[in-house]
Amino acid sequence: MSESLYSIRMRSSCDERHISGAENLAPAERLHALASAMVRRALAHDKGQAEQIFLSIEKVDTADIVCHGLPDIRTIRVASVEQGRDAALSMLEKAGVNPQAARRAMATMARGAAPNGDSMRGAMLVDASTGQRLEKDRYRGVRVSRMDLDEQTSVRLKNLLQTAGLDNPHVREALVLAAKVIHAPGVIAELCWSDDPGYTAGYVAGASLGYVRFPLLKPAGEVRGGRAFFLSSDADLAQLIPYLERQVVLIDRIGRIFPDERWPA
C-alpha cells in the first residue's frame, strides 16, 4: 500500500457521560471533511449535545496494517426484546459460550455494566466458560480502535446494504468493528446492542457465526447498551488488548447477506 493513511478518531461527552464516537482511516486530503462530519455528529446526537469533543489524528505506518474481510450477515426477526435476547443467547451458546456466562453478561449489560449503572465507554471482557469479567477498568473497559473499510470495499458494502434495506451508520460501523474483534486472538464471540436511545437492534458475532443481527435487543428509549467480548480461558490479555486498541485493521472484502430468518425457526 503506497498511499499514506491517518487514523482520525472522535469521542464526545457531556457531564462526563459518553455521547458518541467515530473513527476512520483516511488519506490526508479527506481529513478536513471527516473532522467536520465528526464534530457535526457530536453536536446533533440522540443522546444530547456534546460539551466536550476530542479529535485525535495520527499517521499510520502502512507496513503495520493488517487486512481482514467482513463477516457474512444474517438477520433474525423476533417479536419482542425478550425473544431477541433468547435468540442472542442461543447464538452465543452455539459459538461456544457457556450459557450461564452468556446470561450473566447480558444481564450486566442490561442494568448498566459500569459501576454507577451507566454504559461502559468500551467493552467488557468475559471468560466464556466462567462468566468472570476480566477488564481492569469497569468504567472504560476495552475500546476497539483503528479500523476502517478501504475505499472500494466501502462502496461495495454500501451498495449491498442498500439492496437489503440495511444501509445505515449503525450497521456499517458495527460490521467493521465486529470484523476486527472476531479476528482477535482468544475471542470466541461478541454481544452488542447500542446505547443510542432510538436504535433497538443488536448482534452476536463470531468467527463461526458471522454477524447475526436482531432488530430487537433492547426497548426503545433505553440508553444502556454496550459490548461483551467472550474469551477462551487461555486468552492472553497482554496480546489481545493491544490488538483491539492499537492494531490498524483495514477491511478489504465484503461478506454475503443471507435472507432474513424468523425466531424461533
Swiss-Prot record:
Reaction(s) catalysed (UniProt annotation): heptanedioate + ATP + CoA = 6-carboxyhexanoyl-CoA + AMP + diphosphate
Function: Catalyzes the transformation of pimelate into pimeloyl-CoA with concomitant hydrolysis of ATP to AMP.
Record-given protein name: 6-carboxyhexanoate--CoA ligase
Gene Ontology MF annotations: 6-carboxyhexanoate-CoA ligase activity; ATP binding; magnesium ion binding
Keywords of this entry: ATP-binding, Biotin biosynthesis, Ligase, Magnesium, Nucleotide-binding
A Pfam family assignment: BioW
Oligomeric and partner information: Homodimer.
GO biological process: biotin biosynthetic process
Cofactor: Mg(2+)
EC code(s) of this entry: 6.2.1.14
Family: Belongs to the BioW family.
HAMAP family listed in its UniProt record: BioW
Pathway: Metabolic intermediate metabolism; pimeloyl-CoA biosynthesis; pimeloyl-CoA from pimelate: step 1/1
Organism: Syntrophotalea carbinolica (strain DSM 2380 / NBRC 103641 / GraBd1) (Pelobacter carbinolicus)
Enzyme class: ligase
UniProt KW Methyltransferase keyword: no
